[in-house]
Amino acid sequence: MNPMRGAIGCLLGFLAANGCAGEEFFDRVESALSFSAREHQFRARVSGTVDLEAYHYRQVPPGLIYADGDTLFNPRLSLFLDAQYGAHFYAFAQARVDRGFDPSDQGGRMRFDEYALRFTSRGGIFNLQVGKFASVVGNWVPRHGSWENPFVTAPLPYENLVAVWDIAPARSTTQLLNWSHVRPNGLPGAEFTEKRLRSPIIWGPSYTLGASAFGEIGKWKYAVEVKNAGLSSHPEIWGSTEDRWRHPTVGSRIGYRPNPTWNFGISSSTGTYLRPTVAPTFSPGSSLNDHRQTVIASDLSFARHHLQVWAEVYHARFEIPTVADVETFAYYTEVKYKFTPQFFGSLRWNQQRFDRIPNGPLATRWGRNTWRIDVGPAYRFTPHMQLKLQYSFQRQNDAPRNDSHLFASQFVLRF
């Protein structure tokens, strides 16, 4: 039996047997998980999602999926705490129990992905937030949760791994091209083995430590952040403070909303892409500041009636003193259409291209030009349960097997 189908069947059977499928049950849960004190001056609420995901592929696991074999079942429990005191102080936290931040076949574990305190001025013109939380860059991060994201996976800029390692800089052009696997002379299985060492332009929501200031003035929104790690940093170091604040990452976004239909934004970020532990291996005169990732991005969104559209464009430059400043360009366009109050479908086009770098008398691309199309129907059974399906077809230039296919499903229970 398909593990996803069996898990969903068991869950739905449990809900039916206990009379939980009705909205009255979820209303009781919401009431039981909500608290207030001091005449409602202090309010707190616990909420969460249960995600049951299944993936099937016939090649090296795509994106940020880490597993042997060609099928993966990935359950996840996410718990959220929101607390507010008066009109000016707010705190939130997110804890997860799963097999790792990204889908994998490892054992289960628990961790805190987010925790932060926020001060809001009168009118919301100025907000100050301190803690561990998602990046302000782009427009996908605010809707990356399993309930809000119409797809199972992230757009290409957030999960396509490039030939940049965070544990060591490339020492030569030859080494960088070997890491990118654009040459067919690599060892069998090397691409899968090295997968955990590589980085994307931005790793998902990038839950890093730091502080941000943001607000809204008329039709304009602004956000500035100072974080302990760059956008491409790996999840296991997002909470690290070891020698991080000597080389912080600075990011920003300016948004403009001329009317309720359109929303535009420009983002930027700059910081080192290497871990501080790499610094002792540098040659004299070199430092982490010489190995920077600089990102410029633009985004837009459109919403009218049953149609929603999102798009983002990313340009990233990685400074590698022993090679060159290598650049990549990535974008996606995503469309969601609601056919009925419960059924909607989504279509996403993704593409990433890599610049050429000097390679002897020639110039060679330092990565595989890639395009991918994602198709995702979804059905929302109730305001608390939904099922999403996804098919992705991806093509890479210079890959041993150019084409790859991904089938994914995700059942989400929200409470």
Predicted features and spans:
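Cleavable N-terminal export/targeting peptides
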Residues: 1-24, 151, 156-162
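Glycine- and other small-residue-rich loops at beta-strand/loop junctions that grip anionic moieties
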Residues: 202, 243, 324
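C-terminal/domain-terminus segments
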Residues: 223-247, 397, 401-411
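Outer membrane beta-barrel
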Residues: 32-56, 67-232, 246-251, 255-263, ...
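Outer-membrane beta-barrel pore domains
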Residues: 25-26, 58, 64-66, 105, ...
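N-terminal periplasmic/intermembrane-space "pro-region" immediately following the signal or transit peptide
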Residues: 9-64, 415
